[in-house]
UniProtKB/Swiss-Prot annotation:
Xref: InterPro entries: HisE, PRib-ATP_PPHydrolase-like
Protein name per the record: Phosphoribosyl-ATP pyrophosphatase
GO CC entries: cytoplasm
PANTHER family given in the database record: HISTIDINE BIOSYNTHESIS BIFUNCTIONAL PROTEIN, HISTIDINE BIOSYNTHESIS BIFUNCTIONAL PROTEIN HISIE
Amino acid sequence: MSGDGHDGDEVLDELFEVIESRKEELPDGSYTASLFTHEKGENAVLEKLGEETTELLLAAKDDDDEELAHEAADIVYHLLVLLSMKDMELADLRAELRKRR
């Protein structure tokens, strides 16, 4: 673990802001925007979460730390997209995690 302090919070906040912005503006060529307009709707994100979870499990099984971090980041990203699709906030996730301390 690195000594980044609350940098992780800032990264998540910034990422969620970008996701929310893409949801509103739907810029051409944006992968994030394409998830909000996909013909499968939220099922596209749910499928992606399943795919990324499988890849994360394989990376863990193979003791591939670099790939594990990569796949974990993919899961977090797609989870944040799903929260946005459900009109939830990052604060909702944080509140639930605080309850579990």
